[in-house]
Amino acid sequence: MSDGHTMHILRAEMPGPTAGKLVSRMSDTAKILYGMYFVMTLVMIGLLLLGGMDLFDASVHAFGAAGTGGFSSRNASVGAYNSAYIDIVTGIGMLAFGINFNLYYFLLMRRFRDVAKSEELWAYLGIVAFSTVTIAANIHHLYGAVGTSLRHAFFQVSSIITTTGYATVDFDQWPGYAKTVLVLLMFVGGCAGSTGGGLKVTRVVTLVKAAFMDMRKMIHPNAVVNVRMEGRAMPEKQVRGVQAYFSVYMLLYAVSWLLLSLNGFDLLSTFTALSACINNIGPGLGMVGPTGNFSAFAPWAKLLLSFDMLAGRLEIFPMLLLFVPSTWRGNRLRRWERRN
């Protein structure tokens, strides 16, 4: 397959609004990314082994964090180990896999300036830091010790923003502020070019900047203003593409929420069940919290949530294109042309 065709596939499958090559050949770029993914996973397995996990559990939890899938071999998830060391290692591991993998390549190539000027990275780390500190303060009365509060807050923030879904405690029992922040983090997601789901940090930053740009244009109609990322003006087409994605995302969310409400469950459970699925988190709140599950949903609702999970993971558009008649007409025309 040519590099041109491969690039089109990359743009379709890449989590986030942008995709690019690290080196001249796409095949070499893929090897670099897969190599970093493999090495980081092995490092995490080794660190978990040092914490007392056996090889099977360490491998399961490392792969669950690496792919931000969140699968655990224990019913109580990572909380079953009741280990501060394992919590910290897993939390940092999840956070690392939520970062754009291109930045790790830049670090290896000593391109520190490219890493330092990444607005998405600083926004990501800033959101994590703010959320961790404020949630820790909000739940301090539940755990007493500052260190314990920070540990649980950091782990859950890292788990939710990277869309991994691991848990050390039943955060459904936390105060309202802490739960609200976690729900908001479900929508933010990881960085573009990471294994995380959600909207992606770069899209959120772009949407906020575009909103301020539009407000400035309303105040100063003749002013020439652009959305700037990392010191460069973003093409108008790219900004509108992010806004279009967000609009389709919210439309799918609204339709799915309306249909799920027919199950008759409480608002919180329905809302967070959909949020957890479309953003690929796993646990939500209420009946689908860390100690709950989705078994009470009707079969058709489970199919809908399954579709939302796939749509969210594939960046929505590829899934929705399946229902556009012209997609199939175009394929039939190309097959007819090849036969003739």
Predicted features along the sequence, with ranges:
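Membrane-proximal intracellular helices of multi-pass ion channels
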Residues: M1-N340
